[in-house]
Each structure stands twice: as C-alpha cells, then as structure tokens.
C-alpha cells in the first residue's frame, strides 16, 4: 500500500516499530469484495457520508443558535442572513438531512431484499434497525429547533401521540414535552437530544455496526 520511498523513511519506520501500521494497511486494503457487489451496496456508505456532513454543519451552527423559545427563531434568521456562508451551511444541513433519511431507507430495503439480515448477520441487522430509529429521531428533534410555526406544531402533534397509550400515555407526553404543555422545557430537551444524546448513541451503534460488517464481510448473493 505504501511506496518504497515512504517505507524507507525514518518517520514511517518510527511509526511502524510502535504501531505496525503496515499490517493495519494490508488488512484494510486486502479485504475481499464479492463479485456480485454493485452500486446499491454503497447506500450505507452514502448514509455515513451524509451523517458526517450533518455533524460538521450542525457543529458550525451551534456557535450561533440559541435554544430558547424567545431567541431560537431569531438566531436561525441571523445564521441565514448575517453569518458568513450561514445560509449555505444551514441549507447543506437541511438537504443532507433529507438525503440521509432517504439513503437510510434505501439501504434498509437493499439489505432486506438481498437477505443481508440472515444468519450469521442478525446482530448487524439489529444495530442497523437501531440506527434507523436514531436517524428518524434526529429528524424529529431537529425539525423543532427553528421554533417556527411548522416546528412548533410538529412537536405538539408528535409529542401528543403517546397520550393514546393507556395508563402511561400522559406520563410519556409530559416526559417528551418537559411539562404539561409545549414550551421552553420541550425545546431544551429536543436540543439536548439532537446535539448530545443522539450523536453519542449513533456513534456507538455505528461503531458496532461497522465492526460486525468488518468481521463478517458482505453477504453473498441470494
């Protein structure tokens, strides 16, 4: 994988002596790829790429976004109108979010239709389903953060759905809203979920998902 000029350098030899990077490079570059693999097997990688774009653009917006019911909408307008390239960053975040959900759905269908969920890859499928749920949760929580009319009523409707569940329904609603009604508590919880809890969860399950794929390889044709 490395050229002779690189492998003969003192810097390379220093790292090789301590980390055995040649063995790591050989393992990465020599993994067998079945001949039946086509472009549809790239959907998972595209989903990951969309997530990385989401992470970068979302992190950039946290410098300007204010998670309060009185300032959230104004801070989003500030990002769009006054921050250098803010309109571009938020637009990329918005469209890559839609693309991530679409690619995730297509990836799930591809795995299901090609039988990639069967033995011995059941746990890979389970972690994938968990990742799908987390991805949708990103969409639900992120949709509310601009705190405009669309975001407010979307949160009100979504958080009110569990009220139909007997006994525990009202408790779940209050837990989701941070109180009896939609307000500052709701926005704070959704912001915390969107920027801290869900990113950590998706990182953990992505790591598990990739390690399993790396260990078991790509499933064979039907």
Swiss-Prot record:
Its main location: membrane. One of its GO terms (molecular function) is oxidoreductase activity. Binds 2 heme b groups non-covalently with two histidine residues as axial ligands. Binds one heme group covalently by a single cysteine link with no axial amino acid ligand. This heme was named heme ci. Heme b 2 binds at residues 93, 194. InterPro entries: Cyt_b/b6_N (IPR005797), Cyt_B6_PetB (IPR023530), Cytb/b6-like_sf (IPR027387), Cytochrome_b_N_euk/bac (IPR048259), Di-haem_cyt_TM (IPR016174). Heme b 1 binds at residues 107, 209. GO terms for biological process: photosynthesis; respiratory electron transport chain. GO terms for cellular component: plasma membrane-derived thylakoid membrane. It is found in: Cellular thylakoid membrane. The keyword Iron-sulfur does not apply. Heme c binds at residue 42. It comes from the Bacteria. Signal peptide: none annotated. Its cofactor is heme b; heme c. Keywords: Electron transport, Heme, Iron, Membrane, Metal-binding, Photosynthesis, Thylakoid, Transmembrane, Transmembrane helix, Transport. The chain crosses the membrane at residues 39-59, 97-117, 123-143, 193-213. It is a multi-pass membrane protein. Component of the cytochrome b6-f complex, which mediates electron transfer between photosystem II (PSII) and photosystem I (PSI), cyclic electron flow around PSI, and state transitions. The 4 large subunits of the cytochrome b6-f complex are cytochrome b6, subunit IV (17 kDa polypeptide, PetD), cytochrome f and the Rieske protein, while the 4 small subunits are PetG, PetL, PetM and PetN. The complex functions as a dimer. HAMAP family: Cytb6_f_cytb6. Heme 1 (or BH or b566) is high-potential and absorbs at about 566 nm, and heme 2 (or BL or b562) is low-potential and absorbs at about 562 nm. Belongs to the cytochrome b family. PetB subfamily. This is Cytochrome b6.
């Amino acid at each position: 994988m490395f050229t002779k000029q690189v492998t003969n350098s003192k810097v390379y030899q220093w790292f090789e002596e301590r980390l055995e990077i040649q063995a790591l490079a050989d393992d990465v570059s020599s993994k067998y790829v079945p001949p039946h693999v086509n472009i549809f097997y790239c959907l998972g990688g595209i989903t990951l790429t969309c997530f990385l774009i989401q992470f970068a653009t979302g992190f950039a917006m946290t410098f300007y976004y204010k998670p309060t019911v009185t300032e959230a909408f104004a801070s989003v307008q500030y990002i769009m109108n006054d921050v250098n390239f803010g309109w571009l960053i938020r637009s990329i975040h918005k469209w890559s979010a839609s693309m991530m959900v679409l690619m995730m759905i297509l990836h799930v269908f591809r795995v299901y239709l090609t039988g990639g969920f069967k033995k011995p890859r059941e746990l890979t499928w389970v972690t994938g389903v968990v990742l799908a749920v987390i991805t949708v949760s990103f969409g639900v929580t992120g949709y509310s953060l601009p705190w405009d009319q669309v975001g407010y009523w979307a949160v009100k409707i979504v958080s009110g759905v569990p009220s139909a569940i007997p006994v525990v329904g009202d408790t779940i609603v209050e837990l989701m809203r941070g109180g009896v009604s939609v307000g500052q508590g709701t926005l704070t919880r959704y912001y915390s979920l969107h920027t801290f809890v869900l990113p950590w969860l998706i990182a953990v399950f992505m790591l598990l998902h990739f390690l399993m794929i790396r260990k078991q390889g790509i499933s064979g044709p039907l």
